[in-house]
């Protein structure tokens, strides 16, 4: 498994996004040791993406997530910026398009969507044995992926206002032509037929614009799950990565055993996405088993029970359980951003506070020896999690 995190580049004094990605990208590549992962540019010069290499150990993945954030933060400081884990900018910004013909075509073709859509997500890749297995996985995880939106929710503010959503990034992202959930495919052949048909419409520039909630990667032998905000805390990134791997493993085992997938309509999954984006973990989510609204803690507990055998098999159960307990105890990035705004009344300060979470997490790692290690729990930045999941979630 591996992850891609998109980070917002903000001014160190004001918290306003700044177009310094070209310099940060060059500096990060020059600083990089061999075989680290990757640092790449995005469509707007106010953001950058960091990727891990593939890992089998969740703890090792977490260590590289921290290392990636620390690297781009260090380089960004040289340009008067922070690399902030923010899924949208709390302050108003007019993005600057990066160099490249494809990006300029997107800016020209899709109107206000890319111009107002400075959004940062988390993408999780999990290896599969074959495309056929991958499609079977897509068909079986689609009703569970809305829970990941709620867990990662980290974008309550946009363009200087509280949007009323926990994940406004999800709402903004849904404007892209192909974004969102799909109906069941049923076979690799059907997946190919559907996606090729989407490309034939001419609404998308290329295969890279198949912005499905989850898809077969066109570059790697993986399933790529794309619904999450970039989390405020690196520990949440690790927790979500562990859950996604377990979701994929569980779905693959169901397929191999002949278990049928649920025939939940895509419109229902889309509404589940919307509910998750609205309230995060502070309200209700859609129960994938009944299609009815239920308290968020109950739905997260259902997901945990669904994938627990895979978590145990991967050795991830304790780390993920503690990560979820910590998330419920401390709140999502959205709730913590709102708490910071209630204290400061300044959205620029909210952005700057978010930028420091990666710095503090790195300091906690050095002080406590948290990553990598066998007993990492979900202590990130020196904040211990609850001792178990039952008190916080169950």
Go through each PLM region and give its residues.
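C-terminal accessory/tail domains of diverse enzymes
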Residues: 1-79, 173-394
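N-proximal short alpha-helices
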Residues: 34, 38-41, 45, 97, ...
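Well-ordered mid-protein domain cores that form the structural environment of catalytic cofactors
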Residues: 53-120
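Histidine (H) residue identity feature
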Residues: 55, 82, 96, 104, ...
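Residue-level preference for long, well-ordered alpha-helices that form the structural scaffold
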Residues: 61-65, 130, 137
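Metal-dependent DNA replication initiation modules
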Residues: 86, 90-92, 101, 105-122, ...
């Amino acid at each position: 498994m591996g992850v891609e995190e998109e980070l917002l580049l903000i001014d160190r004094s004001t918290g306003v996004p700044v177009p310094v990605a070209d310099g940060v990208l060059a500096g990060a590549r020059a600083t990089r040791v061999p075989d680290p992962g990757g640092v790449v540019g995005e469509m707007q010069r106010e953001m950058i993406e960091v990727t891990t290499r593939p890992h089998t150990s969740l703890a090792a993945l977490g260590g590289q997530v921290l290392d990636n954030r620390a690297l781009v933060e260090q380089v960004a400081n040289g340009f008067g910026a922070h690399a902030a884990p923010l899924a949208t900018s709390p302050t108003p910004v007019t993005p600057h398009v990066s160099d490249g013909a494809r990006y300029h075509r997107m800016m020209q073709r899709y109107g206000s969507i890319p111009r107002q859509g400075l959004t940062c997500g988390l993408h999780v890749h999990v290896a599969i044995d074959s495309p056929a297995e991958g499609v079977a996985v897509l068909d079986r995880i689609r009703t569970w992926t809305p829970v990941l939106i709620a867990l990662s929710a980290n974008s309550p503010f946009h363009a200087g206002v509280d949007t009323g959503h926990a994940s406004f990034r999800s709402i903004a992202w849904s404007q892209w032509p192909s974004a969102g959930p799909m109906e069941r495919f049923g076979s690799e052949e059907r997946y190919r037929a559907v996606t090729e048909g989407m490309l034939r419409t001419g609404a998308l520039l290329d295969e890279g614009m198949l912005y499905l909630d989850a898809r077969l990667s066109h570059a790697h032998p993986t399933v790529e799950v794309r619904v999450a905000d970039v989390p405020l805390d690196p520990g949440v990134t690790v927790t979500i990565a562990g859950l996604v791997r377990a979701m994929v493993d569980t779905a693959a085992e169901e397929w191999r055993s002949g278990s049928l997938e649920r025939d939940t309509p895509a419109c229902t999954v889309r509404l589940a996405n919307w509910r998750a984006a609205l309230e995060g973990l502070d309200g209700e989510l859609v129960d994938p088993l009944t299609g009815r609204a239920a308290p968020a803690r109950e739905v997260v507990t259902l997901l945990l029970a669904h994938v627990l055998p895979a978590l145990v098999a991967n050795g991830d159960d304790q780390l993920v359980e503690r990560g979820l307990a910590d998330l419920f105890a401390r709140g999502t990035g959205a709730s913590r951003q709102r708490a910071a705004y209630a204290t400061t009344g300044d959205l620029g300060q909210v952005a700057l506070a978010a930028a420091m979470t990666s710095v503090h997490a790195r300091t906690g790692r050095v002080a406590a020896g948290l990553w990598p290690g066998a007993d990492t729990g979900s202590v990130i930045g020196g904040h211990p999690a609850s001792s178990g999941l039952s008190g916080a979630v169950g």
